[in-house]
Amino acid sequence: MAPNLRKSHPLLKMINKSLIDLPTPPNISAWWNFGSLLGICLITQILTGLLLAMHYTADTTLAFSSIAHTCRNVQYGWLIRNLHANGASFFFICIYFHIGRGLYYGSYLYKETWNTGIILLLTLMATAFVGYVLPWGQMSFWGATVITNLFSAIPYVGQTLVEWAWGGFSVDNPTLTRFFALHFLLPFMITGLTLIHLTFLHESGSNNPLGIVANSDKIPFHPYYSTKDILGFALMLLPLTTLALFSPNLLGDPENFTPANPLVTPPHIKPEWYFLFAYAILRSIPNKLGGVLALAASVLILFLSPLLHKSKQRTMAFRPLSQLLFWTLVANLLILTWIGSQPVEHPFIIIGQLASTTYFIILLILFPITSALENKMLNF
């Protein structure tokens, strides 16, 4: 009998082990779809980004008009741009759901997979930030100025670091050029990290909603989950195309329709919606260095999740108190997102400070305490 090429060919064998014959728990829910959706987001962003880069000019005098040219004169340029801009939003929606799933179902106990995932999140955030600067509108320019300026809060080397990042004494042509180079490079770095992420995941196999070992009754990935993933793709690409075609500027900032002007500051400088929660935490501390540290901690705190897991059960499926706390955390993040979009005035300042404090208290203190309490309740 001839050998099955799918199982014997060096390259096809790898694909087979990852996408076809991969043993998968039989009970993983739709919350497990977001990993593959992130893969589709990445592919979409790289393809649309590549097409946009072919028509983009990384120069302060030409960047804004080169994008206007892409939208007006390039075949379907408007569609490519709208898909790329809104694709970023969907990328973040998927990654936040993916992380939320990981927290809820205790997936962070696969430490290597979790840690590479956080590094992926940080790289994605960096990519989105440098990408937002490229259209060289008002919010692009001032967003770049405000966020890069935060590095100056680092003692002793801060100012040098900022001027080194800028390539001068303000955000100018060298900054735009290097941001374009970084925005082109980072997605490929994300692709590499994704492969590492998957390698670690396939070492242990997938977690499942019950948080128990499912080795005894695993099923092949194809056709069961390949079909389920394709349904997921359709359900994500439909709202993405709807948004890109019917309301492409819904999530953008109107300020960005004005070319960058270093002499005019916009009344409210704010990032894209997916960074607002972190921006609110940054603003809630009246000290520059303190704000920067809180901003970094808001994401880096995820590294502590495996260490703060005190429960005897892996998932929150049978832990009602932890569930309540988890959804309180979600509500809290939505409040932070709202606060980040508001001006710095009463009552938003105090709400932001309370929500920021609550965010850290829930993750660092209340989750471990609640887990310990639930462990006690198991004995009754």
From Swiss-Prot:
Top-level taxon of the source organism: Eukaryota
Cofactor note: Binds 2 heme b groups non-covalently.
Ranges in coiled-coil conformation: none
Signal peptide from the UniProt entry: none
CDD domains listed in its UniProt record: cytochrome_b_C, Cytochrome_b_N
An example molecular function term from Gene Ontology annotations: metal ion binding
InterPro entries, sorted: Cyt_b/b6_C, Cyt_b/b6_C_sf, Cyt_b/b6_N, Cytb/b6-like_sf, Cytochrome_b, Cytochrome_b_C_euk/bac, Cytochrome_b_N_euk/bac, Di-haem_cyt_TM
Positions with a binding annotation for heme b b562: H84, H183
Keyword Protein transport: no
Transmembrane segments: 34-54, 78-99, 114-134, 179-199, 227-247, 289-309, 321-341, 348-368
Pfam annotation, one family: Cytochrome_B
Cofactor(s) annotated in UniProt: heme b
GO annotation terms (biological process): mitochondrial electron transport, ubiquinol to cytochrome c
GO cellular-component term (any): mitochondrial inner membrane
Job of this protein: Component of the ubiquinol-cytochrome c reductase complex (complex III or cytochrome b-c1 complex) that is part of the mitochondrial respiratory chain. The b-c1 complex mediates electron transfer from ubiquinol to cytochrome c. Contributes to the generation of a proton gradient across the mitochondrial membrane that is then used for ATP synthesis.
Database matches in PANTHER family: CYTOCHROME B
Protein name in UniProt: Cytochrome b
Species of the source: Pygoscelis papua
